[in-house]
Curated annotation (Swiss-Prot):
It is found in: Cytoplasm. Its EC number is 2.1.1.166. Gene3D superfamilies: Vaccinia Virus protein VP39 (3.40.50.150). This is Ribosomal RNA large subunit methyltransferase E. Belongs to the class I-like SAM-binding methyltransferase superfamily. RNA methyltransferase RlmE family. S-adenosyl-L-methionine binds at residues 46, 48, 63, 79, 102. It is an enzyme of class 2 (transferase). It holds the Pfam family FtsJ. Its main location: cytoplasm. The keyword Glycosyltransferase does not apply.
């Protein structure tokens, strides 16, 4: 594959090209500080968890798929939608400084359907953030551009001081993938 980021992953020791997307976001938005508590949703294979951990954060990685261990990262294999109550019991009243979501559905090839499916994952990630994100915290979520991403962005603007669209240079140019970087959580009522 002629993809400079795929080629760089083995040289730089990252598990996935997506690590570079998070590095770009951190360079622009200063997402991480040493000692922060971070949740990485859709973590497997672990590129984002690696980046956050290398920044000195305490990372809990969640994914429905298995993930090989990363030094200093706690991994929980689970479905954040169907096992939400189990996670709520596990984390109880814990709050996290940053919640990252690079979750994406398996692509079916129909852009409109893929958009709907990722927006459902975005809503699940946001519900998770409503429960577990600390006041002033940061929420980063992957979206596919489509008819409802602006509505989702407007929903975020009611809960965060700043919300920005970001397309990393390391994203494939033909991809509709973008990220919403939401800073300064001011709160909202969880839906469940």
């Amino acid at each position: 594959m002629n993809d400079q980021y795929v080629q760089k992953t083995s040289k730089d020791g990252y598990r996935s090209r997506s690590a570079y997307k998070l590095v770009e976001m951190d360079n622009k938005f200063k997402l991480f500080q040493e000692g922060q508590k971070i949740i990485d949703l859709g973590a497997s294979p672990g590129g984002w968890s690696q980046v956050a951990s290398q920044k000195g954060a305490n990372v809990v990685a969640l994914d429905i798929k298995p993930m090989n261990a990363i030094n200093g990262v706690e991994f929980i294999q689970c479905d954040i939608i169907n096992e939400f109550e189990i996670l709520r019991e596990k984390f109880k009243d814990q709050k996290f400084d940053v919640i990252l979501s690079d979750m994406a559905p398996e692509s079916c090839g129909l852009k409109s359907l893929d958009h709907i499916r990722i927006m459902l994952l975005c809503e699940a990630a946001l519900n998770f953030a409503k429960h577990f994100l600390s006041h002033g915290g940061t929420f980063v979520v992957k979206i596919f551009q489509g008819e409802s991403d602006k509505d989702f962005c407007n929903e975020l603007k009611k809960m965060f001081k700043t919300v920005k669209y970001f397309k990393p240079k390391s994203s494939r140019s033909e991809s509709t993938e973008m990220y919403l970087v939401s800073l300064g959580f001011i709160g909202s009522k969880p839906s469940i």
